[in-house]
Amino acid sequence: MSDTISCTPETATFEAPQLQFNEDGWGPCELPDAFKDIPYQPFSKSDRLGKISDWTGTAQTDKKFSNKYASQFGGGSQYAYFHEEDETTFHLVDSARIQKPPHQRGRFRGNMRNNRSGRGRGARGGVQVGGMTTLSKSANKMRDQRRGTTRKWGMRGPPPKIRDASVTVRPDWVTIEEMDFPRLAKLSLPSVKEGEDIMTCGTLEYYDKTYDRVNVKNERPLQSVDRIFHTVTTTDDPIIRQLSKTHGNVYATDAILATIMCCTRSNYSWDIVIDKIGGKLFMDKRDNTEFDLLTVNETASEPPQEDGNSLNSPRNLAIEATFINHNFSQQVLKSGEKEPKYKFQQPNPFIGDDEDGEVASVAYRYRKWDLNNGITLVARCEHDAVLKMPQGDTQFLTIKALNEWDSKIANAVEWRQKLDTQRGAILANELRNNSCKLAKWTVQALLAGSDQLKFGYVSRAHVRDSSKHVILGTQQFKPQEFANQINLSMDNAWGILRCIIDICMKQKDGKYLIMKDPNKPMVRLYDIPDNTFDSDGEGEEGDDGEAFQPMYGYSAAASTSANVTAAQSNTSATVPDQSEKASA
């Protein structure tokens, strides 16, 4: 008899776990005993537990991206391998050079299978070792040059030089416009016709062709020419005052126009005062400024550094370059009472009745240009000499001088070694270091309508003596051809000038100032009070209560050291101050 088994199903129960309530934050309040005193360290299975010495790799690696793809796990020191030196196992190793067999004497033939020089498609001139490409020393050097860095400054480039503005901006000046160089470089005003002559003044001497045969082996000393150069601004020009009644509505000089047209190449700060009177613009330079001084190595990668009263400070180099240009432009002429001269219709307007001394050979050509939209520009341009051609016609010259001061400091080619054989390399170096100055000279020659632009190569007789110079050679160009060589676009130059004129024409009558920012590639237009820069008398400070600021923004005083001043006074041409200008 079988027993009946009754299976009564039991009811499933659920017991809720005991939860801890953390009043101070989140997470458990107590740590279980099983997990106490266990250190936590981020860990990844792909991490290496130690460092392996790779004796087949090269020491020259690309350190910049060494940690780009490295994992942050396993960064603790408990997993790293530390090698402890054991003095008992120390022994000397024979380091004598082993002569390789002939078939392994190539550059990378020791392990051609693993080391491949990257010269094919997609290669970058490196060496592939164990699947990792490392840059060679030459490739690293080329990379640094492309990035503009050097090892001298720790791969960060030289520290930026902070320059001061050419004039102190006062709080009551109102900024009207900021024009950055990339935007100005895109402007263009094509189809501007050749300037039309309104009046010609002055007397010119003829160029001495014997200076075309000067070379390094037949150098000539630069002589001191005691002549007066007039640097008259726009509103002080009696001819422009007369022409402003009948011709044009914008007035300037060739130097002022060239500064504005070539502003995108400039690094130093400069400023130009613009007066708007009755719908007419007068562009002026300020009195007692260094506007007329020539910059030296302004656009070089390492421009001259300020070093007190050193001969190679920016201000002293500018003074030296200016006097070299004055003396050179007069020495290469056929001067003398018996020598013929080329006279224009009117005499020099800046020679006063009580003026003592001989005036430099400079002729002035007053010209006008139609810039469309009712804008007519009237400007005073200059010629330096004339040249009689074999065909009988006369050509007008613009004469300038390039000066060498210290080729080692300037990182330039030494002229005495390369001028006769590699003149193109020297000129290319000058174009790189003095791009703004050469562009302004070219613009001035084009505005004046000069037939030739003649350059002289003048160097110091001794590197440490700025008082004696020698002429090493000359070179001439047609202004338009030279403009094409230096990538100077007159359409862009006219466009920059027209842009600034249009902005000023929209303003009310008053005084304005356009200034190149000393540390940024841009120019600013300010609305300034009418009495700014006015002076009660000669030698006094303006009503702003401060003396003029130097053009380059350095702290050098207006007077140089005693030896520099004495040296310059012995070799320089006489340059009168603004107070010596002839009155209208």
UniProtKB/Swiss-Prot annotation:
Compositionally biased tracts (Acidic residues): 533-546
GO cellular component terms attached to this protein's record: eukaryotic 43S preinitiation complex; eukaryotic 48S preinitiation complex; eukaryotic translation initiation factor 3 complex
Location(s) in or outside the cell: Cytoplasm
Residue ranges, compositional bias (Basic residues): 100-122
Low complexity: bias regions: 563-575
Region (Disordered): 100-165, 529-550, 563-584
One MF term in the entry's GO annotations: mRNA cap binding
One GO BP annotation of this record: cap-dependent translational initiation
Pfam families: eIF-3_zeta
UniProt keyword terms in alphabetical order: Cytoplasm, Initiation factor, Protein biosynthesis, RNA-binding
Region of interest: RNA gate: 290-304
Broad class of the protein's primary localization: cytoplasm
KW Cell inner membrane (keyword) present: no
UniProt free text on domains: The RNA gate region regulates mRNA cap recognition to prevent promiscuous mRNA-binding before assembly of eif3d into the full eukaryotic translation initiation factor 3 (eIF-3) complex.
Subunit structure comment from the entry: Component of the eukaryotic translation initiation factor 3 (eIF-3) complex.
Function: mRNA cap-binding component of the eukaryotic translation initiation factor 3 (eIF-3) complex, which is involved in protein synthesis of a specialized repertoire of mRNAs and, together with other initiation factors, stimulates binding of mRNA and methionyl-tRNAi to the 40S ribosome. The eIF-3 complex specifically targets and initiates translation of a subset of mRNAs involved in cell proliferation. In the eIF-3 complex, eif3d specifically recognizes and binds the 7-methylguanosine cap of a subset of mRNAs.
UniProt family annotation: Belongs to the eIF-3 subunit D family.
Protein name: Eukaryotic translation initiation factor 3 subunit D
Species name: Anopheles gambiae
